[in-house]
Amino acid sequence: MTTKFEATTICAVRQNGHNAMAGDGQVTMGEKVVMKGTAHKVRRIYNDQVVVGFAGSVADAFNLEDRFEKKLNEFSGNLQRAAVELAQEWRSDQALQKLEALLIVMNKDDMLLVSGSGEVITPDNDVLAIGSGGNFALAAARAMQLHAKDMSAKEVAEAAIHIAGDIDIFTNHNVISETL
């Protein structure tokens, strides 16, 4: 059985010129058992200049995070180029096509969603969210951006995860966040 991070929530926010990404800590085995409540699904890479968050199979997510960091090194930290190259490789390599994960990658200038079907998506409204609670976090973060402009990016991202955790049974309130 493969451990999945699908039952997780990651939210990235750009607010007031700052970026933050937050994720919950729950790892669920199947649909009935919480295996861990303190997993770190949001991490800094590339000399702490890039934050990556992932949802999907644990092994697949780590594999893709490692491949993405190699692409960042290959392209001297160019986030968009590294993301596009990873997406192209992911889509064209038959072994990689079987990987079940999504990545949100972010530096001080850009925020991108990278999927296994070859998409590299830049959000229209400075918020991205993935995982089982992703839609709840996305809606909450967008509402806070519109109506609570005094909140920091970190406060918005963390609050969005907490709101998702109140609704989604696969998301807990042990929030890990990183800011840029």
From Swiss-Prot:
Keyword Protease tagged: yes
Keyword annotations of the record: Allosteric enzyme, Cytoplasm, Hydrolase, Metal-binding, Protease, Sodium, Threonine protease
Classification via PROSITE patterns: PROTEASOME_BETA_2 (PS51476)
EC code: 3.4.25.2
Record Pfam families: Proteasome
Enzyme class: hydrolase
Regulation: Allosterically activated by HslU binding.
Sequence similarity: Belongs to the peptidase T1B family. HslV subfamily.
Name listed for the protein in its UniProt record: ATP-dependent protease subunit HslV
